């Protein structure tokens, strides 16, 4: 298996980074299903941070995406599934680990103030 973070880096929960189109190129060339994976690790290990907080990282494997999708549809579905699940996992984690909640709320407020550019596709 190949594991790829389509954003190209870790992201803080509640923030959005455009997905890189390389995953769509691999998808179109490999004729293999893509299994989206969402996690809440950003609650405990922030982007550009060496400091880590104690907590349990939750990883959720989502249903495989079929191999016959158009590139734009694939990117949109991949991003929608990962982001919505990651947000749910982050909220659940913040409920269990209250110290992570302020960063989550701050990131969500900042993200809502600047509109998303949507997935990076060509």
Regions found by a protein language model. Name each.
Residues 1-122:
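Non-catalytic C-terminal accessory region of glycerolipid acyltransferases
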């Amino acid at each position: 298996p190949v594991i790829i973070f389509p954003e190209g880096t870790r992201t803080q929960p509640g923030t959005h980074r455009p997905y890189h189109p390389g995953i769509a190129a691999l998808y179109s060339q490999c004729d293999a299903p893509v299994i989206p994976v969402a996690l809440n690790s950003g609650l405990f290990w922030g982007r550009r941070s060496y400091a880590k907080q104690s907590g349990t990282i939750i990883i959720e494997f989502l249903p495989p995406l079929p191999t016959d999708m158009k590139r734009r549809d694939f990117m949109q579905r991949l991003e929608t599934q990962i982001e919505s699940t990651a947000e749910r996992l982050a909220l659940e984690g913040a409920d269990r680990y209250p110290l992570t909640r302020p960063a989550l709320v701050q990131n969500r407020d900042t993200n809502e103030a600047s509109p998303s550019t949507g997935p990076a596709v060509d």
